[in-house]
């Protein structure tokens, strides 16, 4: 992926979510890059939404046990680990704790899902224009082509649940962490 795309994607993440920055004491956009690299290390397909040649949103999905893109997935995973263990992050354990909070799937659902919506983000200045809907529809189409039937969506209380309801998603479980 081109560096300018990575930079814009990290900028979107940084502007929208904390991603463990406050607790980890990480400098600048370090947590945004860590999160982006972790997303890319598991993502099967990634879709970008642009307006006037500027990335205004992106979405991706992961597929459990996929053997595709192994080299690039490992590269991005390594980049995330390097950043976590760098001097840019004061409290490394805080990053690991933050990540573990969102990787919680109940054991009775382990075999229900084929994969996960790894990311869906739209710049707050471009919301309400149908970009989120277009991105999610594209991800659903690509996942279907990839023979997937059930994608899990893990999110937090900042999520717009009405959006997912309108898209036909079904809430299976709600947990507070």
PLM region descriptions:
Residues 23-46, 51, 60, 82:
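Active-site rim helix/loop that mediates acceptor-substrate recognition in acyltransferases
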Residues 133, 145, 157-174:
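Conserved active-site alpha-helix within GNAT-family acetyltransferase domains
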Residues 65-114, 177:
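Conserved acyl-donor/pantetheine-binding loop and adjacent beta-alpha core of acyl/acetyltransferases
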Residues 118-127, 152-162, 177:
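Conserved beta-strand-loop-alpha-helix junction that forms the acyl-donor binding cleft
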Residues 54-63, 103, 116-121:
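Conserved beta-strand in the GNAT
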Residues 122, 128-141, 166:
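Conserved acetyl-CoA-binding loop-helix of GNAT-fold acetyltransferases
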Residues 114-115, 143-156:
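Conserved GNAT acetyl-CoA-binding A-motif
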Residues 3, 10-27, 63-66:
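Helix-loop element at the rim of GNAT/NAT acetyltransferase active sites that forms part
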């Amino acid at each position: 992926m081109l560096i300018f795309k990575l930079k814009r994607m990290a900028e979107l993440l940084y502007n929208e979510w904390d991603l463990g920055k406050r607790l980890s004491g990480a400098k600048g956009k370090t947590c945004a890059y860590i999160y982006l690299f972790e997303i890319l290390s598991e993502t099967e397909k990634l879709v970008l939404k642009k307006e006037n040649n500027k990335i205004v949103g992106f979405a991706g999905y992961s597929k459990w046990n996929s053997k595709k893109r192994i080299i690039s997935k490992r590269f991005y995973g390594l980049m995330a680990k390097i950043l976590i263990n760098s001097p840019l992050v004061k409290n490394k354990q805080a990053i690991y704790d933050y990540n573990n909070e969102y990787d919680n799937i109940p054991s009775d659902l382990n075999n229900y899902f084929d994969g996960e919506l790894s990311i869906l983000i739209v710049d707050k200045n471009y919301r309400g224009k149908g970009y989120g809907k277009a991105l999610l529809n594209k991800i659903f189409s690509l996942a279907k082509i990839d023979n997937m039937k059930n994608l899990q969506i893990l999110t937090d209380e900042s999520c717009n649940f009405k959006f997912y309801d309108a898209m036909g998603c079904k809430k299976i479980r709600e947990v507070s962490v």
